[in-house]
Regions:
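Positively charged n-region of N-terminal signal peptides that target proteins for export
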Residues: 1-4, 140
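Sec-dependent N-terminal signal peptides
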Residues: 4-14
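Sec/Tat signal peptide C-region and signal peptidase I cleavage site
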Residues: 15-19
Length: 315
């Protein structure tokens, strides 16, 4: 059974690598949900922490979360957008854990105009995702996880609906403090489109590694994102981060997202492109036995940044 599950996960992860890039929807699913992951560049799938928010990035990491943990998250995003999340888990067997989560993104109220640019009213836009998770320790060091998502989106009077799946694997060596992960996110499709044109899911295949250096407080992380698309430079697939672990309970960290920095470049006064800090992120957290608080700041654009906070409590 374990071998069959492991093989199925690997096969399903390989499918998106053959997919072609196209217009995608539900891109709120790409946003960081864990403040710790956000601090390390926004995409991290390898952190071994008692941090339930990390399951949004890799469902296999659910195996490291304490039983009956409740996690709440909030992020203010660009242009006044707001994103909230919640998750709760239960350990159902010695090696098996389940969880449920919700994500909500609201993009504010906008003017509704006709073809003559006359305002006829206002409309709002929002996205919602409800998910169920299952993780299992295949061996003492290898965990697998799956998340099933039900996603809906509203733009004024228009609505769409989709289903998706995340698949994740994590290998952790506690003796050498190596963590290696592979994840395929948002496999699935639309069941109902806004109009007659169906759009693709934001599929994202990622691989990552984290390593804490012996006898030091430093842990480094490197992730490769969007491995199913190779139409841009290899360097822009990298997300890099470093933690300073001040104690078993306190961390501070920083990261750099190469893709975000490239996408947010603008022309300066000398007509040369620059990211002006876009792609950089910072964060800190305190994780006690039952109470956890993590905070991250991310620079998305020269004129826009984001703050993400997670609060978790073990019941």
């Amino acid at each position: 059974m374990k071998k069959n599950l492991f093989a199925l996960l690997l096969i399903c992860m390989a499918i998106p690598l053959m997919a072609q890039e196209s217009q995608t929807t539900y891109n709120f699913l790409r946003l960081p949900t864990s403040a710790h992951a956000a601090a390390l560049g926004g995409d991290n799938i390898t952190l071994i922490e008692d941090d339930e928010a990390l399951i949004f990035h890799n469902p296999a990491l659910l195996s490291t979360v304490s039983d009956r943990s409740l996690c709440l998250g909030y992020m203010n995003y660009m242009s006044g957008s707001q994103v909230a999340s919640a998750a709760f888990n239960r350990i159902i067997r010695e090696r098996a854990t389940v969880a449920v989560s919700a994500q909500y993104a609201h993009y504010g109220t906008m003017k509704q105009m006709d073809e003559n640019h006359v305002q006829t009213g206002e409309f709002s836009a929002k996205d919602i995702a409800l998910s169920g998770y299952f993780s299992y320790l295949l061996t003492d060091r290898l965990a697998g996880g799956i998340a099933a998502k039900f996603i809906t989106s509203y733009i004024g009077d228009y609505n769409s609906f989709a289903v998706g799946v995340d698949l994740g694997l994590n290998y952790y060596d506690p003796d050498r403090e190596w963590s290696v992960s592979l994840v395929a996110k948002n496999l699935g499709g639309q069941l109902k489109s806004y109009d007659e044109q169906y759009e693709s899911m934001p599929i994202d295949v990622q691989a990552g590694v984290s390593k804490r250096f012996a006898n030091t407080p430093f842990r480094v992380s490197a992730s490769l994102i969007d491995l199913n698309h190779w139409d841009y430079k290899f360097i822009y697939h990298w997300v890099l981060g470093v933690d300073l672990l001040l104690s078993k309970s306190i961390w501070v960290g920083g990261g750099y997202n190469c893709r975000r920095a490239n996408e947010m470049k603008i022309l300066g006064v000398d007509d040369e492109e620059g990211s002006h800090g876009a792609g950089l992120s910072l964060g800190a957290g305190i994780n006690l036995e039952r109470l956890k608080l993590n905070l991250a700041y991310g620079k998305y654009h020269v004129s826009s940044s984001s703050v993400l906070i997670n609060f978790a409590y073990t019941l």
